[in-house]
């Protein structure tokens, strides 16, 4: 958050666009050319952030309440929800402070606002990195449960899961602090982009491998029932659609933000890149949308968690 102009920022000086207003318009870049700028209303941004907060708080509360959910798999899901909660919470807090400063309802010295901005940036950046890590951890956990089913409980133990979780959080905080301190260095930005691509490749390879194994299993069952082609093809199509949705949402929600970082390194002054930079708030909103979708994909589809969630909502503690 810059004191002058009260700009919504996520990672230090990465964004130089003004606070969003509720419209879709053509904006002029530095050369006078026209480019498309999608502006996000503050009310919409806050609403999405609050929805994400509520969803992920419910996931964390449900897993904490039910001891049957204290397994490595649910620990990773809980940490993913906590990461998404912090992503949404940090951005909601930053936006609220900006609006209060703009309305002169909050008086603060420039140094205090800058320190608050730095804290929010570290929290938001570390939670974004940890969110990506836990998405990868969930994929690895599922892969082990399928390909090493008989040895799963000896491979993925609760102590090992806790060690992995602690390592992810520590690494995320350290990396975010480094990233905030040296965000003007191209190497740091590229490291973050490479990290995103690595997570994308990891998830794609693991889930495609799992889909192939599931199709083989379905084919074997179909052969026993002499229904090889209809059952196998139907299962394969359903699995491919599910996989496409999972990876598509991940890429759609996270990809534009990392494209933004890549273009900062490759073409910071190019007119076309300048047009893309103007949509920073849209890219940030897509990440908030991902924080809303994650519980629907990884948490609410599980019957035991849904049952516990009903108990939480009815306050039957």
Curated annotation (Swiss-Prot):
Glycans are attached at residue 29. Gene3D superfamilies: Rhodopsin 7-helix transmembrane proteins. SMART domains: 7TM_GPCR_Srsx. GO terms for biological process: adenylate cyclase-activating G protein-coupled receptor signaling pathway. A lipid is attached at residue 315 (S-palmitoyl cysteine). SUPFAM superfamilies: Family A G protein-coupled receptor-like (SSF81321). InterPro entries: GPCR_Rhodpsn, GPCR_Rhodpsn_7TM, Melcrt_ACTH_rcpt, MSH_rcpt. Residues 1-37, 94-118, 184-191, 267-279 are extracellular. Residues 64-72, 141-163, 212-240, 301-317 are cytoplasmic. Keywords: Cell membrane, G-protein coupled receptor, Glycoprotein, Lipoprotein, Membrane, Palmitate, Receptor, Transducer, Transmembrane, Transmembrane helix. GO terms for molecular function: melanocyte-stimulating hormone receptor activity. It is found in: Cell membrane. GO terms for cellular component: plasma membrane. The chain crosses the membrane at residues 38-63, 73-93, 119-140, 164-183, 192-211, 241-266, 280-300. It comes from the Eukaryota. It is a multi-pass membrane protein. It holds the Pfam family 7tm_1. Receptor for MSH (alpha, beta and gamma) and ACTH. The activity of this receptor is mediated by G proteins which activate adenylate cyclase. Mediates melanogenesis, the production of eumelanin (black/brown) and phaeomelanin (red/yellow), via regulation of cAMP signaling in melanocytes. Belongs to the G-protein coupled receptor 1 family. Interacts with MGRN1, but does not undergo MGRN1-mediated ubiquitination; this interaction competes with GNAS-binding and thus inhibits agonist-induced cAMP production. Interacts with OPN3; the interaction results in a decrease in MC1R-mediated cAMP signaling and ultimately a decrease in melanin production in melanocytes. This is Melanocyte-stimulating hormone receptor. It comes from Nomascus concolor.
């Amino acid at each position: 958050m810059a004191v002058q102009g009260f700009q919504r920022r996520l990672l230090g000086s990465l964004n130089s666009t003004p606070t969003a207003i509720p419209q879709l318009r053509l904006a002029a870049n530095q050369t006078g050319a026209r480019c498309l700028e999608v502006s996000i209303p503050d009310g919409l941004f806050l609403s999405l952030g609050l929805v994400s907060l509520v969803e992920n708080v419910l996931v964390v509360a449900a897993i904490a309440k039910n001891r049957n959910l204290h397994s490595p798999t649910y620990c990773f899901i809980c940490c993913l929800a906590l990461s998404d909660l912090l992503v949404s919470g940090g951005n909601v807090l930053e936006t609220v402070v900006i609006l209060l400063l703009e309305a002169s309802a909050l008086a603060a010295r420039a140094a205090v606002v800058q320190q608050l901005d730095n804290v929010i940036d570290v929290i938001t950046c570390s939670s974004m990195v940890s969110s990506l890590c836990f998405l990868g951890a969930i994929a690895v956990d599922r892969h082990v449960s399928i390909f090493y089913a008989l040895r799963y409980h000896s491979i993925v133990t609760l102590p090992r899961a806790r060690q992995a979780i602690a390592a992810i959080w520590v690494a995320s905080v350290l990396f975010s602090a480094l990233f905030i301190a040296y965000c003007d260095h191209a190497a740091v930005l590229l490291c973050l982009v490479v990290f995103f691509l690595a997570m994308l490749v990891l998830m794609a390879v693991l889930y495609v491998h799992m889909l192939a194994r599931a199709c083989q299993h379905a084919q074997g069952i179909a052969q026993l029932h002499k229904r090889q082609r209809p059952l196998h093809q139907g299962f394969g199509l359903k699995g491919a659609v599910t996989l496409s949705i999972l990876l598509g949402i991940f890429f759609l929600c996270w990809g534009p933000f990392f494209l933004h970082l890549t273009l900062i390194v490759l073409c910071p002054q190019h007119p076309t890149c300048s047009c893309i930079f103007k949509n920073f708030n849209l890219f940030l909103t897509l990440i908030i949308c991902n924080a809303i979708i994650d519980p629907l994909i990884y948490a609410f589809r599980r019957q035991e968690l849904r049952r516990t969630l009903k108990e939480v909502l009815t306050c039957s503690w």
